[in-house]
Amino acid sequence: VLRTLLVTNDFPPRPGGIQNYLNSLATRLPADDLVVYAPSWERSSGSHVEFDAAAPFEVVRHPTSLMLPTPDVLRRAKQIMRARDCEAVWFGAAAPLALLGHPLRQAGARRIVASTHGHEVGWSMLPGSRQALRRIGETVDVVTYVSKYTRNRFAAAFGRHAGLEMLPSGVDTTVFAPDPAGREEIRARHGLGDRPTVVCVSRLVPRKGQDMLISALPAIRERVPGAALLLVGGGPYRKRLTQLAEVLDVADDVVFTGSVPWEELPAHYNAGDVFAMPARTRGKGLDVEGLGIVYLEASATGLPVVAGTSGGAPEAVLDEVTGHVVDGRDPGQLAETLAALLSDPVRARRMGEAGRSWVAENWRWDTMARRLSTLLDGDPVAAVR
């Protein structure tokens, strides 16, 4: 692999899906061939100082918590690139930092890769930011995408010169795996006993559909006595969701765990009998699910999965094989689907086993990291413009 500088706003210990995506790939590249340039992160829950000390690769922190394509960020990126003899640049999120691609190529970058995730779909719908995507597409060698949906939505915005390559999220199937002991521990912690349980692991925001899970719960409980809902994650929507559960008289049947440590996530998946995140597109198409790594993590854990139709979410499920794809705006359909799975453990287990096999064969991080290495090592194809 060409010695690579990863320039990104999104990196641990700051939490989030993009952060986990980039770190999961970064830790699988040769550590001596990677330098990361990312913002500072100081919170009561953790500091970048501890994270960087334990990282296998070098991390250089920007003095503030936000990086934009400014002259200061460009100057620092050039300094790092030259001091560490980096020949490739990888932008963790194309928009907006990959606008620095052209000057970094002039500074000596032989190969430039820019990753996308989902928010670029929104950028592609707004005239000003669409122009920024076009500039990026004309100056980088490769734009990676996480799902066919996102590619179809923003390919035209990046322009005909953009080299588009798929690089979706992966799953560590040794971490996300069936774990009966972890299941019992989490169930005991939250008083779930042997109740049939739907689990959702996600930030509490409207797009993810936790409100629809709560709305569907009364109908589910009519068919599946004792059914409960385990909502794993924190976020601004919690108060609204708590109120909804109280109004629908299911407050005692909905468990809010709040944010949980990353190392406890596999056990929380295991605590469920079915995984569901009925994601729906919002904001006139601007707020959309890029892929939905949680569906794949749930499948790797051996759970049947129920996904919404938003964006690339259906690509993370084999409909009727590893789970079901439903309309995230229809609590009736959602209730019917979940009740059927909860009341048929044999079918649910069969879907979960199929999901684990599918993820192990097609979605492993090691496979994705090898693909990224190939993209970073390729011959330069974009002329300096």
Kindly give the residue locations of the regions a language model identified.
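Short hydrophobic beta-strand element within catalytic cores of glycosyltransferases
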Residues: 276, 295, 300, 304-307, ...
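Short His-centered aromatic/hydrophobic patch
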Residues: 91-97
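Acidic donor-binding loop of glycosyltransferase active sites
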Residues: 259, 270-288, 303
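A short, well-ordered alpha-helix in the C-terminal region of glycosyltransferases
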Residues: 226, 253, 333, 340, ...
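Conserved donor-binding/catalytic core segment of Leloir-type glycosyltransferases
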Residues: 144, 192-208, 214-217
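Carbohydrate-associated surface elements
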Residues: 149, 170
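Nucleotide-activated donor-binding/catalytic signature segment of Leloir-type glycosyltransferases, i.e.
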Residues: 239-264, 274
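Conserved acidic donor-binding segment of nucleotide-sugar-dependent glycosyltransferases
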Residues: 316-320, 324-332, 340-346
